[in-house]
Amino acid sequence: MAPIKIGINGFGRIGRLVARVILQREDCELVAVNDPFITTEYMTYMFKYDSVHGQWKHHDIKVKDEKTLLFGEKAVTVFGNRNPEEIPWGGTGADYVVESTGVFTDKDKAAAHLKGGAKKVIISAPSKDAPMFVVGVNEHEYKPELDIVSNASCTTNCLAPLAKVINDRFGIVEGLMTTVHSITATQKTVDGPSMKDWRGGRAASFNIIPSSTGAAKAVGKVLPSLNGKLTGMSFRVPTVDVSVVDLTVRIEKPATYEQVKAAIKEESEGKLKGILGYTEDDVVSTDFVGDNRSSIFDAKAGIALNDNFIKLVSWYDNEWGYSTRVVDLIAHIHKTCQ
């Protein structure tokens, strides 16, 4: 079968890591990248060297000319257009476009890519109006007529598989989530202006910063039976990658913590293998850098108050795990449309 041809709009943290994922897969081909803010030469540097995930060592990357990068012998077309409708994706053969600028996250804005010849757009962020899919949870509900979809957020990708298992096995009455989340590119290195979120403008490397997140509520969109039952918040902490979800839930069907652990372990080795992980090791956050699973349940970190009230802890590489799911979702969409 011919590889799935993919273009990337926005060569930031997620854009570059999605590119790394694509280039390591046999079933996918990176054909084009658009970013108006960096040159091809700088693109090669940013792709090759990564402070978190290390140096790219799979094949040489070099500039062929202003409009072309070479990954080994593979040519990738480079554009520098600010307006999505002006990017000629069709000319490169890119059927799927990963929208990873963080700017064009609603359906109307993301639809501009279709004008340039793309057939499907996958938004690598939550969307207010595009249907959201979480691989392992609701991707089977994708219909071929949907041209613009969202891969939800990294936190929703961690929380949803765990919540699905607990809800399917024991029933969730209600719950609260906290994510202890690594810093991201939108934060400030030193105190600076942030009109919409005053706390978010404080120095990222020096503070624990309470923040809002729609990740828990978004679970209700991918699992309608949980709509209105979960909400949550975030603490931004001074680590550069890997985050952890703390999910505290009241369950309908009484169960010991051992029974809950056993259910999660069983699912992690079955239907959710590769998506949901399970560990009983004494792990810390850096142990999950580069982990491509969406959610790794930490059996030793959780606790139960009684047989109906439990706290569950699950790790995720909010960069690499999420980027892997973006490409998995594209592969699923492609298969569904055949």
Curated annotation (Swiss-Prot):
Task: State the source organism's domain of life.
Answer: Eukaryota
Which class of enzymes does this protein belong to? oxidoreductase
Q: Which residues act catalytically here?
A: 154 (nucleophile)
Residue sites binding D-glyceraldehyde 3-phosphate per the record: 153-155, 184, 213-214, 236
Annotated site, Activates thiol group during catalysis, chain positions: 181
Q: Which PROSITE patterns match?
A: GAPDH
Q: Name one GO biological process term.
A: glucose metabolic process
Q: Which reaction does it catalyse?
A: D-glyceraldehyde 3-phosphate + phosphate + NAD(+) = (2R)-3-phospho-glyceroyl phosphate + NADH + H(+)
Q: Give binding positions for NAD(+).
A: 13-14, 35, 82, 318
Q: Which InterPro entries match?
A: GlycerAld/Erythrose_P_DH, GlycerAld_3-P_DH_AS, GlycerAld_3-P_DH_cat, GlycerAld_3-P_DH_NAD(P)-bd, Glyceraldehyde-3-P_DH_1, NAD(P)-bd_dom_sf
Q: What is its EC number?
A: 1.2.1.12
Kindly list the GO molecular function terms attached to this UniProt entry.
Answer: glyceraldehyde-3-phosphate dehydrogenase (NAD+) (phosphorylating) activity; NAD binding; NADP binding
Which keywords appear in this protein's UniProt record, sorted alphabetically? Cytoplasm, Glycolysis, NAD, Oxidoreductase
Report the subcellular localization.
Answer: Cytoplasm
Q: Identify the pathway.
A: Carbohydrate degradation; glycolysis; pyruvate from D-glyceraldehyde 3-phosphate: step 1/5
Primary residence: cytoplasm
Asked if the keyword Cytoplasm belongs to this entry, the reply reads yes
Q: Which GO terms describe its cellular component?
A: cytosol
Q: What does this protein do?
A: Key enzyme in glycolysis that catalyzes the first step of the pathway by converting D-glyceraldehyde 3-phosphate (G3P) into 3-phospho-D-glyceroyl phosphate. Essential for the maintenance of cellular ATP levels and carbohydrate metabolism.
* Family indicated by similarity: Belongs to the glyceraldehyde-3-phosphate dehydrogenase family.
Report further notes. Answer: Plants contain two types of GAPDH: cytosolic forms which participate in glycolysis and chloroplast forms which participate in photosynthesis. All the forms are encoded by distinct genes.
State the oligomer form and interacting partners. Answer: Homotetramer.
**Name listed for the protein in its UniProt record:** Glyceraldehyde-3-phosphate dehydrogenase, cytosolic
Which gene specifies this protein's sequence? GAPC
